[in-house]
Amino acid sequence: MIESQKILVRHEGNTPRERSECGWRDRLISREDATLEPAAWAHAVDIDGAKPHFHKVATELYYVLDGGGSVLLDGFKHEVRKGSIIHIPPGVVHSAVGRMRVLVIGIPGIGEADYFEVVNDNVNYA
């Protein structure tokens, strides 16, 4: 990172990898990069058991890098595959099933205070 210009070049594989609410993620640009004052964060996520949830503040963009499956947005199922992009505004309950690698961009970055799991959801997400 070039401090004076707040520029970042980072390569997948040289990033923190961790279990998240939606699967395994590589933090490409994240809360650890606060000194950059990023307009958003970006994670590469291997979807695995993403539970229904929503955000009150953040918008999410999903771009399917590989694989496929479906995303559920406010109870409606949408098939996705490599090359699909999904726009998820604040307040939309969403989940994903299938085997896919997704670039997830949170605008602004999504913190734990803006993650709300939906516990009593009667929609069949399979």
For each of these PLM feature ranges, what is it?
Residues G75-G91:
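Short acidic-glycine-tyrosine-enriched beta hairpin
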Residues L65-D66, R81-K82, G98:
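A cytosolic small-molecule/anion-sensing beta-strand core signal
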Residues H11, W41-H43, E79-K82:
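Short amphipathic beta-strand/extended segments with alternating polar/hydrophobic composition
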Residues N14-P52, A58, I105, D114:
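A short glycine-rich, His/Asp/Glu-containing loop-to-beta-strand
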Residues G49, V57-S70, D74:
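Glycine- and acidic-residue-biased ligand/ion/polar-headgroup-sensing regions
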Residues P52-H53, V71-L72, I88, V92-R99, ...:
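Short beta-strand His + acidic residue motifs that chelate non-heme Fe in jelly-roll/DSBH
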Residues I2-H11, R19-S20, T35-P38, V97-A126:
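Double-stranded beta-helix
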Residues P16-R17, H53, K77, H94:
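Short secondary-structure boundary/capping segments
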